[in-house]
Amino acid sequence: MVYQNIVAGRFVDRPNRFIAHVEINGVVETVHVKNTGRCRELLLPGVRVILEVAANPDRKTKYDLIAVYKQGFGLINMDSQAPNKVVAEWLAGQGYDVVKPEYKYGSSRIDFYMEKFRMDDGGQEVSERYLMEVKGCTLEIDGIGYFPDAPTERGIKHLKELAGAAGQGYHCIMAYVIQMEGINEVRPNITTHPAYGKAVEEAIAAGVKVLFLCTAVKENELRIVSGRYLGE
């Protein structure tokens, strides 16, 4: 995915989850933060941030904060809407016959439903069904990615839905889009949310596969370049 109109600024502060103050060309602007996570290790006073100019000129906030240069690391895309967009682009080239976003399953909406058609030994067409939930990883500690950066009961619910679906014959995938370069693994952040780590273990035991999606990150672009399943 490509951002159409970007500018750079310096982070000042973050009054709440939704907005931040950023100095752009010498003027402190109130901007929308496209990530409601904590991001405390990223948004430090004075760091260089990247913003997209809002398409609607009449919007109250004229900019979206989409990326940040982490001190001692490099550029990290922190747009929480980006992972699903880049996965949709990536899935289009993965040989699936059907790809449906926002698929209703059980009491949740799973990010993607996919199908692949094949012929069985008797010459009959059969469908392989897939469910994929997508999470974005922006937390890096000592060269390893971690998720989540804040407790997420919703994330646990999705893992349980995938585990149940695996028992019903679906191929279930928990995909982590790593929104930074140089990282190829994501571990459960049991320090922040021990229950999430347990839910991941239970999902894997039920047959859910964990997929790490590595990206190329530029100020105006995020793109998946490779994928690797846990254990490969």
Role assignments for model-derived ranges:
Residues 56-72:
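OB-fold/S1-family single-stranded nucleic acid-binding modules
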Residues 27-41:
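Beta-strand/loop nucleic-acid-binding surfaces
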Residues 9, 110-118, 127-149, 162:
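Conserved catalytic cores of phosphodiester-cleaving nucleases, focusing on short active-site segments
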Residues 40, 71-101, 120:
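Acidic-basic catalytic patches of nuclease active cores, encompassing PD-(D/E)XK
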Residues 179-232:
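Domain-level recognition of nuclease-like catalytic cores that cleave nucleotide substrates
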Residues 16-21:
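Short aromatic-glycine-enriched beta-strand elements
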Residues 143-153, 163-192, 214:
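Nucleic-acid nuclease catalytic cores
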Residues 45-56, 214-215:
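Flexible glycine-rich surface loops and low-complexity tracts that mediate binding to linear polymers
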